[in-house]
Amino acid sequence: MIVTDSWIFVHNPKAGGASVEKALGEPLKSGHLHSPLSAIQKGGRAAFGFVRNPWDRMLSLYAYQCQKPQPPKSPAYQQLIRDNGFKWWLMEDEYFIEGWTPGLEPIQRRSQMWWLEGCDFIGRFENLRLSFSWICGLYGIKERPLPHINASSHAHYSTYYDDESRAFVAEHFAPEIELIGYQFEEG
């Protein structure tokens, strides 16, 4: 998250946020990197962020965790998710156990709307450069090159899903699917 006197950028994980932050400047150092807009006082400032197709986003998150371990992820966890594969990670991992208290899901598995509720503009990762340029013009932000940071390497997301895992994502990420109109697209 970046907060200025006139605007707020809300960093939704795996939706181009690191690239946008690099282009805009440094994020807050006070623990707000992946905070929802509701965590701070908006105070009349414009707020914006980005969403990503949830089927693509979940695969990107999985691939990123397999390729680049993040603290506090241990090498054993990284090997476990590699060995068991994407579907296991998505559906059987401890993150989605039965009875998980709604609203307390692990931060990267929450609906993207949890971060972005109250934003004045929500751009699409799929049109990141165009949306970023538009935002810069709208809010008087000096436009800088938009780098591609934290990219993960994998085939088109559709090749990783079967009917069951596809429906699982549709159910868990219904808010952004309905709001933005995302669909599962074949590669």
Annotate each predicted stretch with a short phrase:
Residues 1-187:
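Membrane-interface amphipathic segments in extracytoplasmic regions
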